[in-house]
């Protein structure tokens, strides 16, 4: 199998499922969540400040997003079967972590 064949999606259905998951994550992280909790930078920074006190070291907003992905991964261990909401949450935290990391580094 060539490199191109390995990288190519198996079917249109698979591509659509991937896009569906990412669109749902995007809908959640760009929807009314900002109104409820503030934008990702504000919300994750607020959590980081609390965790910094608890863990007695500086925690960044990006580290909070990474830790939340870890929390979601731990949920997979505790339950069996397909967990669509957990996959969506992981994608959402990845998007937020990307945003705050990029803003923090100026890249």
Feature roles, as predicted:
Residues 2-107:
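Intrinsically disordered, low-complexity regulatory regions
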């Amino acid at each position: 199998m060539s490199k191109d064949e390995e990288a190519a999606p198996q079917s249109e259905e698979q591509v659509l499922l991937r896009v569906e998951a990412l669109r749902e994550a995007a809908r959640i992280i760009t929807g009314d969540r900002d109104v409820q909790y503030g934008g990702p930078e504000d919300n994750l920074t607020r959590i980081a400040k609390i965790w910094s006190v608890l863990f007695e070291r500086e925690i960044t907003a990006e580290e909070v997003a990474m830790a939340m992905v870890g929390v979601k991964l731990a949920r997979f261990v505790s339950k069996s079967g397909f967990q669509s909401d957990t996959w969506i949450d992981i994608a959402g935290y990845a998007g937020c972590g990307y945003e705050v990391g990029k803003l923090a580094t100026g890249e």
